[in-house]
A protein has these predicted regions:
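Flexible loop/turn segments at secondary-structure boundaries
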Residues: 89, 143-145, 174, 184-187, ...
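An anionic, glycine-rich sequence signature occurring as long contiguous blocks
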Residues: 1-11, 15, 236-349, 432-444
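Short secondary-structure boundary/capping segments
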Residues: 150-154, 229-235, 252-258
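Dynamic "connector" segments at or just before major functional cores
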Residues: 1-161, 166-186, 191-207, 382, ...
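Short, conserved catalytic/metal-binding motifs centered on acidic residues
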Residues: 32, 64-65, 76-79, 94, ...
Length: 444
């Protein structure tokens, strides 16, 4: 017999609980920053801004903001969610102090914060998170400003705000670098692309810079200067290429037998899609030596709207690359993987990027960098602490199932325990995550 469901109004609600902790899973992020040395590195980077020894450590304040963003907050006041829980999270700086720390970070200190991030990343990779290959995805996105902010401007979509350019590591999803730009910044600015690439490379451990690195970009990366800079830096490139009239004419000259079947991620044939190489049909002498032009032809999905440039029911896309190899289907598949950067950007906007709270442009750049730290914390947690579906979960799911877990903090003698609800479906996963993290030697 099924028991009748209890009526909520019969449950007595009081505010006299003792030792209860909400967002208990956030302690995993805090301990992660300590164990991989990020907290100590940030403290060292911002040591000069500490007003007195009794004041809050600026590095820890910045760490707390990053943890708050990783937990789903989007403004400084959201850090209040951890007040009254000092036994687990430690003392939190006031809103005024937090704003003061963020606004004290100028361009020089921002460079030191980036170095601190790189130090922690090297330790995370040494702890087992080093990717098997290195593929950098560069892309821009639009952020709306809902009030007057310094250098906010109209954009090509008739909105108003900023147009940051960022770089994410495809294999792990880590947010390596981003620069804030006015809303009217160009999409194919070579200098901005190379600046972001340089910042991203600086985030990689020194020994990994000796490996083959591929940078991917959409058509915004199709500039002679950027591809030449990639060649000078010893970086392979794969960038979108404009379908000019010359390119379209070359495509129409390709015979049916010169198209090869495109493949999907599993290596199987991709229905309705073919690939061909146009290198010998287009003058690429102005591009770096060894550049190749590859084209994909695909039937648009049912219901898709055709453009006036689609020919014979097919849609064409091209990319320019200096990768070697005769398997052009595999090269096209690798370039197509660039689309995953959209997932990274979406997750980034859900982790502090969407809302830039300050008026000053410099302060919003600091906030953007703090968002990158938050994105990395979630990535590192999945890489070294989680398994199964949680290891690939998006931020919203991680927060709902792990970070927002309720618990009770109890003390027995000299031992302090964080007791999770045994009926919560993901309690065991959170316990296992702490165990995996603590198996890594502490570095601070």
């Amino acid at each position: 017999m099924v028991k009748p469901e209890a009526r909520l109004e019969t449950v007595e609600v009081t505010a006299d609980g003792v030792g209860l902790v909400s967002h208990a899973g956030v302690a995993l992020l805090v301990e992660l920053t300590d164990r991989v040395g990020l907290t100590a590195a940030l403290s060292g980077a911002l040591a000069g801004t500490r007003e007195r020894r009794s004041a809050h450590d600026p590095g820890r304040v910045l760490r707390d903001v990053a943890v708050m963003l990783a937990d789903g907050g989007d403004c400084v006041t959201d850090i209040d969610a951890y007040r009254g829980q000092e036994r687990l999270f430690g003392a939190r700086a006031s809103e005024t102090t937090t704003h003061r720390v963020l606004k004290a970070i100028d361009e020089r200190l921002l460079a030191r914060v980036r170095s601190a991030r790189a130090e922690a990343r090297a330790r995370v990779w040494d702890a087992g998170a080093r990717p098997g290959s290195i593929t950098l995805n560069i892309d821009a996105t639009l952020l709306t400003a809902h009030s007057e902010k310094e250098l906010a401007a109209g954009n090509y979509k008739h909105g108003y705000g900023f147009h940051p350019l960022g770089c994410w590591l495809d294999e792990t999803g880590e947010a390596l670098a981003a620069i804030l730009r006015p809303g009217n910044a160009g999409s194919n600015t070579a200098a901005d692309h190379f600046t972001v690439l340089g910042l991203a490379l600086a985030q990689l451990p020194a020994e990994d810079l000796m490996r083959e690195i591929l940078v991917r970009a959409d058509i915004g990366g199709q500039t002679h200067a950027f591809t030449a800079d990639c060649r000078d830096a010893g970086i392979r490139f794969s960038v979108g290429y404009e379908l000019s009239e010359t390119v379209r004419a070359a495509i129409l000259q390709v015979t049916e037998t010169q198209w090869v079947q495109a493949i999907n991620a599993g290596g199987l044939n991709r229905d309705g899609a073919w690939v061909t190489e146009l290198t010998d049909r287009i003058d690429l002498s102005a591009w770096p030596e060894g550049s190749r032009l590859i084209c994909r032809s695909e039937r648009p999905h049912p219901g898709a709207q055709f453009t006036i440039f689609d020919d014979h029911g097919y849609r064409y896309t091209c990319f320019l690359t200096d990768q070697e190899g005769n398997d052009i289907a595999k090269l096209e598949l690798r370039h197509r993987g660039r689309a995953r950067v959209e997932d990274s950007i979406r997750s980034g906007k859900d982790t502090g990027m969407r809302n830039l709270p300050h008026h000053a442009f410099e302060h919003n750049q600091t906030w953007l960098e703090t968002s990158l730290i938050a994105q990395d914390l979630l990535c590192w947690t999945k890489l070294i602490c989680l398994t199964g579906e949680l290891a690939t979960a998006e931020p919203k799911r991680l927060r709902q199932r792990l970070l927002h877990t309720a618990a009770k903090l109890v003390r027995h003698g000299r031992r302090t325990q964080l007791k999770l609800d045994r009926d919560w479906p993901w309690s065991e996963a959170l316990v296992a995550a702490f165990q995996r993290l603590r198996a890594i030697p502490a570095l601070c």
